[in-house]
Amino acid sequence: MAQDEQVLVVERKALEQAGMFQGLAFDVERYFSRIFVPGVPRYMSRPQAEADPAYKQLIPYVIMTCDGKVLSYVRGRRAGETRLVGLRSIGIGGHINPADDMPLFSADSREAYLAAVEREVAEEVSVEASHTNRVVALLNDDSTEVGSVHLGIVHLWALDSANVGKREQMITQMAFMSLPELREVRDTMETWSQLCLDGLAEMTR
């Protein structure tokens, strides 16, 4: 990672005020009303954020579905997060940087966040399909080193066609897979994807 990279974070105590959880939380508005208010989101150097569990880096985690199948891929050697290399994932997304021009101290921070997610996804994959975009859950996993300093915001994109191509070299073996196929390879997935796979029925209601 670049030593001067700035990433979007919130203090852990903002989550604690809304109710700390382990795994998935489906009451999105309860947490968004604490996170996306002026003065709460801020930028911090990524090396500092990676070492300080008092802060959570906000990570959009976009799950794409089409005709009952879910987009999946394996994180290759060029993955930015080396601790996840070689693991299967069903989430597209990454850190939000200041270049995303998100107004942190205005009432529009939530809308700006959603626009930043679209840009982040476009850096990793090309989506030549119309889609819906719903925030369906928040994801917290304090049981791992990676998870303790990140908070996932799980988006569900329902695509009207499977026309998705990769842009990032770290994305390998990309394909739409059925739920039975994904369950067969669950043990090869990163923890966040395992949690999302287990909660997919709730997310798609």
Residue ranges and their predicted role:
Residues 1-171, 177-205:
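N-terminal leader/linker segments that precede catalytic domains of diphosphate-processing enzymes
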